[in-house]
């Protein structure tokens, strides 16, 4: 398996397709999310900004991807740089085989290169997605906020 950092339009299209799959899955857990969203150029447009990390894993073909960005730099409000994990998706056949962990490790390594130890990664996980919640907890992430909706 190989991690490829997104650099061109072709890479971005692969990630757009993964994001559509993730959105479709999350729509089954959260009624606010529309199921048939078509993603176009989200990753391509994101690459224009500094401090964005987009990568995917291949095993002869793409099997998973990750998308994160610097939301709040250290300074005025935060004591550390806040990186938001926007999306993590692994094809079902490859889940529980270390692919997600590999992608998260690649994100953390990128963050260390950019910010040394002066960062946190924030993740929003849908409550009904217990597998994802357990996965992040297993990697050492802890609950710090709860979003309430009416």
Regions found by a protein language model. Give the residues of each.
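A short beta-loop-alpha structural element at the N-terminal edge
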Residues: 1-17
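A short helix-loop-beta-strand connector motif used in the catalytic cores of GNAT acetyltransferases and
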Residues: 44-55, 84
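Conserved beta-strand-loop-alpha-helix junction that forms the acyl-donor binding cleft
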Residues: 95, 106, 117-132, 149-150
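Conserved beta-hairpin
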Residues: 50-66
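Conserved GNAT-fold acetyl-CoA-binding loop/helix
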Residues: 23-43
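Conserved beta-strand in the GNAT
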Residues: 61-70, 84, 89
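Conserved active-site alpha-helix within GNAT-family acetyltransferase domains
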Residues: 101, 113, 125-146
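Conserved acyl-CoA
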Residues: 91, 102-119, 142
């Amino acid at each position: 398996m190989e991690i490829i950092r997104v650099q061109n339009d072709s890479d971005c299209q692969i990630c757009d397709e993964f994001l559509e799959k993730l959105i479709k899955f999350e729509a089954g857990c959260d009624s606010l999310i529309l199921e048939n969203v078509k993603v176009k150029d989200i990753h391509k447009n994101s690459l224009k900004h500094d401090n964005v990390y987009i990568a995917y894993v291949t095993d002869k073909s793409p099997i998973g991807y990750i998308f994160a960005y610097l939301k709040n730099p250290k300074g005025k409000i935060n004591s550390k740089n806040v990186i938001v994990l926007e999306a993590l998706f692994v094809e079902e056949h490859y889940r529980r085989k270390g692919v997600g962990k590999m992608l998260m490790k690649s994100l953390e390594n990128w963050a260390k290169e950019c910010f040394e130890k002066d960062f946190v990664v924030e993740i929003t996980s849908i409550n009904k997605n217990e597998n994802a919640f357990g996965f992040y907890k297993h990697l050492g992430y802890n609950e710090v906020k709860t979003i309430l909706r009416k």
